[in-house]
């Protein structure tokens, strides 16, 4: 039992992996570099490493020295987990167990739970024997130690082998029942440092005690002595960030629902204007695919009268409607009209935005298609009639027929070449279908309920999903209050959606932090710690502000408002509650951008923790790998090549010139200096 435990390094990655091997979940070990700063978050305990004093060593490992702070009451000592270190090199495991087995909110796992239950009420010595007789602990301990060398260096007579190397020791600082205890396995009793103040945490008192101890050991020198090291046992950061991300994503969904509900009440014309334009786009597609080319003058006159009759009454200012986007690709040879004259072709957009319908207005798309149909592509061969019929059937399935009361909007084709026209049309229709199926396309400004997929049939509401709108507000890693600052250009989706909602080019870049960040100030501190609640009338508040004392599980916190928000939309329109008094659309957009920034920051922190855990495992494998086989093979190869003897002689001569001791050769010189026998001198003469 007293043999076989190896020394462990003071490394947070090693201790973290050792905790996992013990079977403990949700715990990791971090290194503390600054004793002057407060420790963020909850801390289960501290593990302090210091250089062991030579004078305190003896054959009996447990020191019998007592002072005023030692706790000698058996009832107090036996009720906490304090064990004597009866096995050499086991202080690292003792320090970890002293922290873990004295915490109530840690998932210990089967091994440590069994040890804690079995040793309840035992004396410190009996607990030390229990640790030594647990093979699971010894196996986990040695699995993270460096391989022990096979041949130890020769010992010098009269000097203990322990004194030839520096020895370090681990102790624990743990809060137990409102008091700070120092648990040292090489002392008979635990040390009570007393309670901490009411206006401070136990970590503050522990830092003061450790700084005083370092100051006494270093005689007042600065507190950066390399002979000391401090590590903290804390909750697993990965679980923390995963839980935070879960809450943030639920709150993002709630904010999107609030924005959707608010837009339905304050801007119903966006939804009302969608019906005629959707039916109109279907007729435009059919007319472009079936009608033969006619004269330009008749189409111009018909198109001009139709735009004067429909556009003024149907299209709200600054709103983007789905109908023109659909018709743009179905009129390959149309011309833009302005008082009967042909408009000049508009300047081209960048290549990565040129083919996206959310990056340009409907009129610009018509002008682009009128300027060049087969631009940058060769003319495809004529398509058979069956392809046109299939495309027509696809469009009929995706869009219903126009109601009888609507007037068809005729296309304006130029006289095309007789051969390649059907092929170009089929290709444009395929592009239309691809754009409609794109998950990031935003054709209207009114978002719908979350988790809704784009429907092939039109409805009275928007077909954009909440996730699509949320993707428009991805922001870099910044603080919530800085998320509205113009530090980078907004995406085309964000700019266009803002223009649809507010009639401005870049309102998110012009947000007034005092005016539009009211939602961020009120709800910002709660977006990452609690669930936001959306009431039936569109008001947002944290669950802590609700009058109900009981909180439903996380899965039901947001689902209930989601189910009740849609049926109450019509009722909210009738009552016309002043939604802007609570949060305006711009304030909700600012809050949404704040949530997106927090999500990005949490995802980056989670990735960092995952990478750190991978590095811990890589370092542990490098530490525990046995390099003896490689070294022996390399030396054997040198000997076979005849290079080993010359290398040894060369290095010995270099070390002699530099005055470096080489073990036994240096030890044999000392008695030679004291020899004064005359035969020896005569022999030298």
From Swiss-Prot:
A GO BP annotation: chromatin organization
Region annotation (Disordered) ranges: 273-325, 363-425, 440-493, 550-579, 659-685
Q: Which Gene3D superfamilies does the record match to this protein?
A: 1.20.58.860, Peptidase C12, ubiquitin carboxyl-terminal hydrolase
Site-annotated residues for Important for enzyme activity: 184
UniProtKB keywords? Chromatin regulator, Cytoplasm, Hydrolase, Nucleus, Protease, Thiol protease, Ubl conjugation pathway
Q: Provide the reaction this enzyme catalyses.
A: Thiol-dependent hydrolysis of ester, thioester, amide, peptide and isopeptide bonds formed by the C-terminal Gly of ubiquitin (a 76-residue protein attached to proteins as an intracellular targeting signal)
Domain ULD: start-end pairs = 626-654
Cellular component per GO, a single term: PR-DUB complex
Q: Which GO terms describe its molecular function?
A: chromatin binding; cysteine-type deubiquitinase activity
Question: What residues make up the catalytic site?
Answer: 91 (nucleophile), 169 (proton donor)
Motif stretch (Nuclear localization signal): 673-678
Residue ranges of every copy of the UCH catalytic domain listed in the record: 4-235
The entry's protein name is: Ubiquitin carboxyl-terminal hydrolase BAP1
Give the originating organism: Xenopus tropicalis
